[in-house]
C-alpha cells in the first residue's frame, strides 16, 4: 500500500493544521487545536475555523490547489522531482514552503530534488533549484529576496520578499496587460 501524503500548514508562521491525503483520493484539512484555542483567523474564507476536518472528495480543496504552480514552473518542478507524473498534492508539498500570500505548506519528509533533470544554463530553471516556492499562474515568475536594492532568487527554506515576473513567449501580451490593468 502506498504511503499517503501529508503536510503541516502554517498561516503567517503560525502552525494552523494538517493537510492529509486520504484513501480514495480525498484530501482533508484539519485545524490544530492550539490554532483554534488561540483564536486565530481562518486561513481562507472557504475554510472556516472549526474542529471538524474540511473534506475535499476529489483531490486538493480549491484554496490549496490554487497555490500550486502552473505552466513552465510546474513543468520545471515536476522534472526536479525526477518523475514523469507528479500529483498536484506532491507539487504543493515539495514547493509549498513559500506560496504567494500568508500560507506555507511544510513537508515533514521533503523529497530529494533531481537537478539532473533541469537545464542549469537557464537562469529561471536554476532559480527553481535554489527555491521551494510555489507560484500559480501562466506567466513565468520566481520568488525573490531583496537585499540592499538587489534582487536574487529565494533559497530553500527562505521566505521571499517579492515576486519577479518575466515575459512569456506563449503569452506575449501578459506584461502589457498587467501594466494597463494596474
Language model regions located:
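Phosphate/dinucleotide-binding and metal-coordinating scaffold of catalytic cores
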Residues: 1-182
Amino acid at each position: 500500500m502506498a504511503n499517503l501524503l501529508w503536510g503541516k500548514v502554517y498561516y503567517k508562521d503560525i502552525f494552523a493544521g494538517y493537510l492529509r491525503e486520504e484513501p480514495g483520493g480525498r484530501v482533508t484539512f484539519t485545524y490544530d487545536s492550539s490554532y483554534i484555542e488561540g483564536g486565530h483567523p481562518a486561513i481562507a474564507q472557504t475554510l472556516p475555523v472549526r474542529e471538524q476536518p474540511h473534506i475535499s472528495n476529489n483531490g486538493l480543496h480549491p484554496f490549496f490547489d490554487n497555490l500550486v504552480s502552473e505552466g513552465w514552473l510546474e513543468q520545471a518542478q515536476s522534472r526536479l522531482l525526477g518523475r514523469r507524473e507528479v500529483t498536484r498534492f506532491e507539487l504543493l508539498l515539495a514547493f509549498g514552503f513559500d506560496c504567494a500570500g500568508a500560507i506555507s505548506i511544510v513537508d515533514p519528509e521533503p523529497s530529494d530534488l533531481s537537478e539532473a533533470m533541469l537545464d542549469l544554463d537557464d537562469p529561471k530553471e536554476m532559480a527553481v533549484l535554489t527555491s521551494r516556492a510555489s507560484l500559480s499562474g501562466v506567466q513565468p515568475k520566481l520568488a525573490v529576496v531583496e537585499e540592499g536594492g538587489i534582487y536574487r532568487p529565494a533559497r530553500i527554506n527562505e521566505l521571499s520578499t517579492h515576486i519577479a515576473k518575466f515575459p512569456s513567449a506563449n503569452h506575449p501580451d501578459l506584461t502589457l496587460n498587467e501594466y494597463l490593468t494596474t
